[in-house]
Amino acid sequence: MDWENDGYRIKNYRNPDGSLRSRPQNIQYLYKAGVSWGKVGQGASSFRYRSEGFGFNDAAPTLFGEEWKPLIASLNSKIFKELLKIQGETLNVTTGLVENLPLLGYWHDENQKIVEKIVDENICDSQNDWNSFETSWDFKRHPLV
């Protein structure tokens, strides 16, 4: 994405008649960390941490907020997988569908630190696994070498 000069070219991309061709939305969240998922897919949805520095779009919706660790833990739980089915999960998991899920306020109790530690460990394990493949930007060497 060409975001040079605060996205000037994108914000000012025009038709020959002078009307705007693009309308960037929610740019205050652009390149911020969040919880993302694939909008279209078969089987259970997988919610994942998306680090800073990446964009988002309709095909990979993203939730933003300070309390993302309990959120990602909740959304990947068996209970929420069942709630998604009840809500009518099809091939498309839209932001509206996720937004309507009842979120429990348990993350401000004594379990918060435990949940956050498990989330951190899972993210670290996933990153280490991904970085062991040459397609990763952070690839250093294959684990068998």
Segments predicted by a language model, with ranges:
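Polybasic, glycine- and aromatic-enriched phosphate-binding surface used to engage nucleic acids
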Residues: 1-113, 117-121, 128-131, 135-136, ...
